UniProtKB/Swiss-Prot annotation:
NCBIfam families: mnmE_trmE_thdF (TIGR00450), PRK05291.1-3 (NF003661), small_GTP (TIGR00231)
Pfam families recorded: MMR_HSR1 (PF01926), MnmE_helical (PF12631), TrmE_N (PF10396)
Cofactor: K(+)
Protein name from the UniProt record: tRNA modification GTPase MnmE
Naturally occurring in which organism (per UniProt): Opitutus terrae (strain DSM 11246 / JCM 15787 / PB90-1)
Quaternary structure note: Homodimer. Heterotetramer of two MnmE and two MnmG subunits.
Record-listed Mg(2+) binding positions: S230, T251
Assigned protein family: Belongs to the TRAFAC class TrmE-Era-EngA-EngB-Septin-like GTPase superfamily. TrmE GTPase family.
Gene responsible for this protein: mnmE
GO terms under biological process: tRNA methylation; tRNA wobble uridine modification
Length: 452
């Protein structure tokens, strides 16, 4: 883990020409460096304009400086932010001057890591910073903001408090080995642990929603050749992304694009049509299509209404899960006769549209949004969306709570019961980072960008 006694500096904005560039410095020498740059004692949390001079006295730029004294800064340390004009050459000259004044280059995520180590953020809030940076939809943004403001930490702390209350009573009996926990006490403690267990299960149930909003809803477009899959992709994306031809088998490989549908991010995947007797190259495309289908969150199964008997290929239909399949009846403008399908009731929903002229797209967007909305679970007033790390820790806590409940009900020794409760607390503590695990922390913050 990087030493906290160093003063670090980095560019906090992306490299490249822009209106502004922002540099950060944080650590014990920050106040001294700020005084040298400003030529006076820095005013806390006030924007101060100054000609930035390097150590040789050369003016590099007219900049704006803001000094945040500890502990009320992002990192919990003295922190300086410098805004320069967005010329990469100027930003690099200022950064090199900060290094010459005693700063060292910050590692990836080191500013946020210091915020965590100095108690400004818990680990789940630090992860929310990364979620906020990468959010690609309103739902992802909302969930990240809730987590950044401590929503997940509060709910986990509520579970921890319940377990601690039970553990305190159990350990009181360990000090008096001649006495057993009375059955009435065991019932009360079991009820408390059942509540803790229920709350942990509620949080775990939000992981599916968390995956969807963080990664985007992988929506795979499937169907027979020439039913309009690529035309639909192009229409949804708003440009000619996929090649469209009257010749079957034009799409040989899958194509992926991201679009916003309401408050959701959708990862659209166009696939090769499922042909009965494909050519060798086309067969390879079909194999890739089936791989994408197996990994889909949502499937848009396309049927062609210009066909007198519109239907899905049997080989495709048997692979579809009705709960995540939306039937899309395309080419409504060319409907040849039968415009109601016998199998419509078995799917999540059905939409009529024309990819060619753009009819029915609002209905399609609405259906996709409704499918995604069903996964959102609010816990109290909070939007919670746990990630895989949180879910794993909660699962370990559940396992320990179940073991504790079994021992509590069977009248096992208080020492054994206390051991399970401590295991549950250890797992729950991992979520907020209250358990010291240096390797885990280093790996997590290494995924952040430099300057954050």
């Amino acid at each position: 883990m990087p030493p906290l006694e160093d003063t670090i500096a980095a560019l906090a904005t992306p490299a490249g020409i822009s209106a502004l560039a922002i540099l950060r410095a944080s650590g014990p020498d920050t106040r001294r460096i700020a005084e040298a740059i400003l030529g006076r004692t820095p005013l806390p949390r006030r924007i101060q304009r100054v000609d930035y001079r390097d150590r040789a006295g050369h003016i590099l730029d007219e900049v704006l400086c803001v000094f945040f004294p500890q502990p009320r800064s992002y990192t919990g340390e003295d922190l300086l932010e410098i805004s320069t004009h967005g010329n990469p050459f100027i930003a690099q000259r200022v950064l090199q001057d900060l290094f010459a004044r005693g700063c060292r280059p910050a590692g990836p995520g080191e500013f946020t890591q210091r915020a965590f180590l100095n108690g400004r953020l818990d680990l789940s809030q630090a992860e929310a910073v990364m979620d906020l940076i990468h959010a690609q939809s309103d739902r992802a943004l909302a969930a990240a903001n809730h987590q950044l403001r401590g929503s997940l930490g509060r709910h986990v702390q509520r579970i921890i408090d319940r377990v601690v209350r039970v553990l305190a009573q159990v350990e009181a009996y360990i000090d008096f080995p001649d006495e057993d926990l009375p059955s009435s006490n065991r019932d009360t403690l079991a009820a408390e642990l059942e509540m803790a267990r229920h709350e942990a299960e509620q949080l775990i149930a939000t992981q599916r929603y968390g995956n969807l909003i963080r990664d985007g809803i992988k929506t795979v477009i499937v169907g027979a050749p020439n039913v309009g899959k690529s035309s639909l992709l192009n229409r949804l994306v708003g440009r000619e992304r996929a090649l469209v031809s009257a010749e079957p088998g034009t799409t040989r490989d899958f194509i992926e694009e991201r679009i916003a549908v309401g408050e959701h991010c959708i990862r659209l995947v166009d696939t090769a049509g499922l042909n009965v007797s494909p050519a060798p190259l086309e067969a390879l495309g079909i194999h890739k299509s089936l791989e994408q289908l197996a990994d889909a969150d949502l499937v848009l199964a396309i049927v062609d209404l210009s066909d007198p008997e519109p239907s899905l290929p049997p080989e495709l239909a048997k692979r579809l899960d009705p709960k995540n399949t939306l039937l899309v009846a395309n080419k409504i403008d060319l409907c040849a006769g039968k415009c109601v399908l016998d199998t419509v009731d078995q799917w999540f929903g059905m939409v009529f549209c024309s990819a060619k002229i753009g009819v029915g797209l609002d209905d399609l967007f609405g259906a996709i949004g409704r499918w995604a909305d069903q996964w959102q679970i609010t816990v109290g007033q909070d939007v919670i969306a746990v990630n895989a790390r949180h879910s794993h820790a909660l699962a370990l806590a559940l396992e320990a709570l179940d073991a504790a409940l079994d021992k509590l009900r069977s009248g096992d020794a208080a020492e054994l019961l206390a051991s399970d409760l401590r295991s549950a607390l250890l797992a729950l503590g991992d979520i907020a980072g209250r358990v010291d695990n240096e390797r885990v922390l280093d790996e997590l913050f290494a995924t952040f960008c430099i300057g954050k």
